[in-house]
Amino acid sequence: MIKRFLTLRASFAIAFFTAFAFSAQSAADLMDRANALYRGGKFKNAIILYRKAADRGADPVAVSFNIANSYYQTEKFPEAAANYRKAVDYSNGTFSPALFNMASVYFRLKQYPECIAAYHRALKLEPDNVSGWLYLGEAYSKTGDKIGALKAIEKAYALDKSDISFVYQLSEANIAVGDFERAVSVIREGYSSHPEEIDFLVYLGDVYRLQKDYEQSAGSYREALNIRPDDVNTMYKLADVLVEDKKQFVAMDVLANILQIQPNFTDAAIFLGNVAYDTRFFERAESAYEQAAKNGSPEAVFGFKNLAYEARLQKREDEALRLLKLAQKYYPADATLEAEILDIENPDR
């Protein structure tokens, strides 16, 4: 944010001293040299010349502001804050770049109440400063003031609805205060304005799911999949919400479709195996675990062990042994598999 105001600062200082070149030529020269040092990254030397310029009658607002910027670049934030404060005082509180930058420094120092106060003063001077409202919202969130954060982000969104990131931020702010209806409304409005942003539909599904409205969540994911039918990540989200909605069989079909599109999606294979296991479709579970194992998943071994355990509960020792040896094929270094196999093969040892 400091960089955003650096150009404004330079034009302010240079314009001022051009106007008074004849009455304070030496101060103007010092400011020009200091600015050149600043642009060259020699911030300590720039500070020395800025102070000399001040002794020669340079404008104290410009000097304090430029010194503050130099301190900021060297990460001396307390010194930067003190000099921004001087620039504000010398300008009788009218130089908004100093206020915005001072607020930014307070944020870096984690002095959030001071940061919030500075942003409010700056935004009274520049009420259309979108980034200022966003940073104010972030500062409020750091203090736990969810309402303050929401109001600030609402201001930013009202000023610029073309930035899709504001839609997400405003929705999150509404969710934070429990206003899911408003969050959904903002997302729908954003999608209406930016129909190319399919991720809005996916995000809408996430919000509905957070609200435990699983049917609406699945509907939003499906709406996105109508446009991007091969989006395996959205398909995975759909399967997940279907399981939460106790629609495991539909979820298994979705997961199977994912694996047809992307056979090496091991998370989907494990998920399918687990859902099939929970619904007692053990053959389907075995197939899914083996697909995951073939593609290097370290988790599939636990699926095989669970299936073997179920087989032993049913007194099907041969089936348990087969499953454990199948697992050993993919995980030969797993000592627990070897131990379980020996236990079945040598029950009397």
PLM ranges: what are they?
Residues 52-53, 86-88, 121-122, 155-156, ...:
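Canonical positions in the second alpha-helix
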Residues 66, 73, 100-101, 135, ...:
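Canonical tetratricopeptide repeat
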Residues 56, 90-91, 125, 159, ...:
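Structural marker of alpha-solenoid helical repeat scaffolds
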Residues 63, 98, 132, 166, ...:
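TPR alpha-solenoid repeat register
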Residues 60, 94-95, 129, 163, ...:
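Residue-level recognition of tetratricopeptide repeat
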Residues 39-40, 73-74, 108-109, 142-143, ...:
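Register position in tetratricopeptide repeats
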